[in-house]
Amino acid sequence: MVASANGVVAWRRRDAHDDPVLAILGGDRRHPARIADKRLLRLLRCFGDVAVGAGTLREQPELVLSPQQPSDEPAPELFAFRERAGLPRQPRNIVYSFSGELPLQHRIFTTAGIEPLVVTTQRGADELARRARPGASPATVAEDLREPGGLHRAQQRLLAEHGVRYLDCEGGQTLLEALHGARLLDEVFLTRTPFVIDETAHEDVGRIFDFAAAGATLIAEGGTVADESWRFERWRFSQR
């Protein structure tokens, strides 16, 4: 996750050019700290499978949850790590959605070598099947996600039916809060940028956890030599 200096992680977009993540990151893709953040993201995708919420999927049409997206520089060492760990070349791309109202033309569902999987409700699974006709729907795990215990059952099925043991959840904040509320969130890797977002200029502003109030412990923190105003934090919620 990335957050501004004042803890903002998202807001309701006004249009396609109003990109919260880009604004929080400062816009300059060549900044050394921005490159470090990207490398960390790619590394974390090596340890298991990767998940996002439906909102993140809709807002990022070019997203593929891979250690090497089509626009990334080659990094064969990342795939070599997965091979040594006995993992498939690409992580499963898991999307959480209550409604199943997902754009099936998205890259996650159309990129060769990517195995998509949707965690949803029964209604959501039915909606996915309708949208996919006459083709096949993506694989789904359907549970009553709004019911206490629904997310727990979904996670148990991800392991039992699909072998999902370690899950790198890239947000957004709504999904992280749901996983935390279900006591499923172990750690958060947070990149805190030096940029301050004017909250009065946006609607439906989302904020990162108050980690101390949520019972998390800061177990690691670092920066970059090029710009120490960027902070890379690792917060632990659970000792599992």
PLM region spans:
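Enzymes that bind and transform nitrogen-containing heteroaromatic metabolites
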Residues: 1-240
